[in-house]
Amino acid sequence: EIGSGLVGSEMCIRDSVETDKFLLTSKLILTPFTSFILVSVIRKCIDAKRPYEKYNIKPLFIKETKGESMPSRHVFSITIIAMCWLYVSVPVGIIMLMLVAIMAASRVLAGVHFVRDVVVGFAVGIICGIAGLWII
């Protein structure tokens, strides 16, 4: 029968993939992906002004973006990547989380984010990482 060949192929493929590796790979791809979409939607909804918009200052980075300042997507992104590393290698994850501070400071000092933007970006990255990697 036609259908039985497809079922047999599916079983063969499923048996050849280690469930633990498949689950790990799925988590490491889907957690950042879905979290990034969530953060992008939150930014559009909040639409917070950036420091250079609010105080009419010139940012150190060439930036013409208006609004969408909170949460910081750069800080969120490096945080969620650090959480993925923490999930597979604690020492590397800890180093990556320390690097988040440098990224956060650079975004604030450059005048493209407020402190609250980077703190919220970090917090959302931690929460999404815990939820997507350890809880779900």
Where are these regions (language model features)?
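Membrane-embedded catalytic cores of phosphoryl/pyrophosphoryl-handling enzymes
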Residues: 56-136
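Transmembrane alpha-helix/helix-exit interface in multi-pass inner-membrane proteins
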Residues: 32-50
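Transmembrane helix-loop junctions in multipass membrane proteins, especially transporters and channels
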Residues: 19, 44-52, 111-116
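Interfacial segments of alpha-helical transmembrane regions
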Residues: 14-38
